[in-house]
Swiss-Prot record:
GO terms for molecular function: nitrate transmembrane transporter activity; potassium:proton antiporter activity; symporter activity. It comes from Arabidopsis thaliana (Mouse-ear cress). The chain crosses the membrane at residues 41-61, 87-107, 114-134, 152-172, 196-216, 226-246, 355-375, 390-410, 435-455, 515-535, 559-579. The gene is NPF7.3. This is Protein NRT1/ PTR FAMILY 7.3. It is found in: Cell membrane. GO terms for biological process: leaf senescence; nitrate transmembrane transport; potassium ion homeostasis; proton transmembrane transport; response to nitrate. The modification Phosphothreonine is found at residue 111. It is a multi-pass membrane protein. Induction: Up-regulated slowly by nitrate. Down-regulated by cadmium and high pH. Circadian-regulation. Expression increase during the dark phase and decrease during the light phase. Belongs to the major facilitator superfamily. Proton-dependent oligopeptide transporter (POT/PTR) (TC 2.A.17) family. Residues 592-614 are annotated as: Disordered. Disruption phenotype: No visible phenotype when grown under normal conditions. Lower nitrate concentration in xylem sap. Decreased long-distance root-to-shoot transport of nitrate but not of sulfate or phosphate. Residues 593-606 have a biased composition (Acidic residues). Coiled coil: none annotated.
Amino acid sequence: MSCLEIYNKDTMKKKEGEEETRDGTVDYYGRPSIRSNSGQWVAGIVILLNQGLATLAFFGVGVNLVLFLTRVLQQNNADAANNVSKWTGTVYIFSLVGAFLSDSYWGRYKTCAIFQVIFVIGLSSLSLSSYMFLIRPRGCGDEVTPCGSHSMMEITMFYFSIYLIALGYGGYQPNIATLGADQFDEEHPKEGYSKIAFFSYFYLALNLGSLFSNTILGYFEDEGMWALGFWASTGSAIIGLILFLVGTPRYRYFKPTGNPLSRFCQVLVAATKKSSVEAPLRGREEMYDGDSEGKNASVNTGRRIVHTDEFKFLDKAAYITARDLDDKKQDSVNPWRLCPVTQVEEVKCILRLMPIWLCTIIYSVVFTQMASLFVEQGAAMNTSVSDFKIPPASMSSFDILSVALFIFLYRRVLEPVANRFKKNGSKGITELHRMGIGLVIAVIAMIAAGIVECYRLKYADKSCTHCDGSSSLSIFWQAPQYSLIGASEVFMYVGQLEFFNAQTPDGLKSFGSALCMMSMSMGNFVSSLLVTMVVKISTEDHMPGWIPRNLNKGHLDRFYFLLAALTSIDLVVYIACAKWYKPIQLEGKDEMQDMSDDDYDTESEEEREKDSKV
């Protein structure tokens, strides 16, 4: 009997070791992923390191780009801020390109690899063009030595390089986040918990990667060593690419699922063609569910989505008419006349997400000020500490440290306390709650920035012509506004990553991550538009305006207070949209979640603590 027990135990261990994932992931060769030797934190940490190195490279260019434009290319403050906003916005618009190619054709891994190569080429081009053509005389572009004029060809080469960087980083970014999440099976209790934790650590890696850029590289570039900073960024991107490729055998993969745009259009066309069709008497029972075995509930081969009652016009795409019955008998269903319920629900999911997504744009307008007006404001303050000068862009280190602190506080203090006191059936602090908290903190951050600017103007020399460091107010007074923005990011952007990834269908996960990037993109473009409008209106009657080249003659504080007011209005609209929103429901997911919760509760406290510390 004891031999039989030993045999059974060995058999069970072998089965556990060869257990396949439940979410449909495959290995590099297209075989079902084995849980024990794929994905999880081994692959997750490789992806986090890759993200940190790529972010270091990106912000090595982006963090001081506004100063490069003003000091090297001789642009004024408003034009430089607008150009940075447009460039940053373009980065995140390219995220849609990457998400589309990933979900439709290439898959997440191949898309990440290709766009990282483009990213490296763009950084190399920028480094070469800066070293050979733009930084003349050598060492120019600091606070003292002006740079010479540049030809149209040189400026064109510069813009070509930075927009190639935008394409590479933008196309890569949403897919690396989703590829990282793919390494954890959400239908497994322990891995599902790790998947939620991954998004927090992903955003932490993003910020820690930019910490080096904002401090060491920021200092070199502020001192005029622009080419050195750009070459360091290039080296970081190359190391990150090599590390990413090394992890290839360990990753879990989802196969690309076809063009999501065509699926979206098929539902709209089919619903329009059947606009005069009456609802079937038996309702949901007479709607098309795919084939008789239910395997093709959606052409994306993902999990079924539970039917909902919103946007009932779209349901007509799944109504089965006499003509559709004839087509089914001939085994030739026309996807432009008849769509499965899950395909219809995919469209509904995206439509429900849109109001929430639109409400996040104003927050991104606030966030983008760190890379533009915060830097210009800091440059006009006292940056000296003894004989050492603080690079204005390095003040964003307070933002990064704040992100790290609040991620720790949220995951180890706030979340456990909230879960302890939540009522039965309650989900505790949801992603929507966290995003709302982020908006509140953003309002406070803009008020703090406006107050600091009021005092900066009070101690400023308004008669100066070269106004860097013209105010006696220490640059460290900017620390509160940077720290508040960092705290708001933990609630808003980490919440967004989790929310859009969880609320998009299986075949649109990269698109979900791209929505978060697109929020940043639209925020940058709206910021650029807002700055342009404010400058035009405030400079009427020959007034210097709110954001002139000499900030001591302007009123940047009023612009910050305007942003605080706009964010407050956005918060009210967001609350209304969040109350209206209904989350996606996957068939069988509730039952699976209940089982997962039971399994998870049986884990020892030691195992849970170990997982939370990864």
